[in-house]
């Protein structure tokens, strides 16, 4: 099987020769710098895939901010306090992505040949208003500025549909993620009622178009997503990543409760400095879920710089072994 056939078969819960081997989140700069000192011959992401024997993929993030969008005063602070501010920054939002879409031509051809999957990211309906309001003001806005929240998300949904229409003329990615980060170690950052009122209507506008294009929709949300998974299904979302182990996520529990759920990630990055025995034990923990289909084991977030080059070589060697074993 080629890379695209294998990924699609896995996500359809069909038999395959082996599971995909991907690093869904590119490595930290500090990690690459360490590995270069330890003998890594390249810092190029795609050459690193080949060097480590990982399956290639290509990701394109279609962000809704133009290059002219003003920088916030500090991390976590936003540029929008109310409707007037939104009107001021709106001319710097929702740019066309003509150049990025044109750049997909070679990726689309490589995907057609089965050489790697194409993945796109769109900003989600929790994530995007947070970038405008700032972290604290965003959480108050659900109660204090509901009309503005709805306007932002309707504008965003309209924008996503325009981007998808233009992109589909060039490339139809294998899967996509909505960047959200709407959960933390204790669960969701919003209630089911808030999700239903402020996010669900806009997912229901965009997700059916993804289905028409045969693009598998995932949510990218850190922390413990477990309680949210049924909410996601209600709006047509099919998968979740990265399923952070340190936040308390358990893929076995999720699989038992949600046999339909596609999952990427969940390999506990904290074991990667503890030697081969600990890394193998983590794969043994995941193996029963790997055998159920619909699950790509991958580091549950970017590989941290505490992991040596030899540690990572050990990890990818075990990944190769267990991706064969899971398909037996």
Regions from the language model: what does each represent?
Residues 20-23, 71-81:
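Short, compositionally biased low-complexity segments
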Residues 61-71, 121-126:
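Short, glycine/charge-rich beta-strand/loop segments that flank catalytic centers
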Residues 41-63, 170-171:
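Catalytic domains of carbohydrate-active enzymes, especially glycoside hydrolases
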Residues 66, 82, 315:
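Catalytic cores of transferase enzymes with a strong primary signal for eukaryotic protein kinases
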Residues 1-39, 90-328:
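Active-site loop segments of alpha/beta catalytic cores
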Residues 78-91:
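Active-site gating loops and adjacent loop-to-helix segments of metal-dependent hydrolytic enzymes
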Residues 57, 74-77, 258:
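Glycine/serine-rich loop-strand microenvironments at binding/catalytic pocket rims
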Residues 48, 68, 95-99:
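Amphipathic, low-complexity, repeat-rich surface-exposed segments
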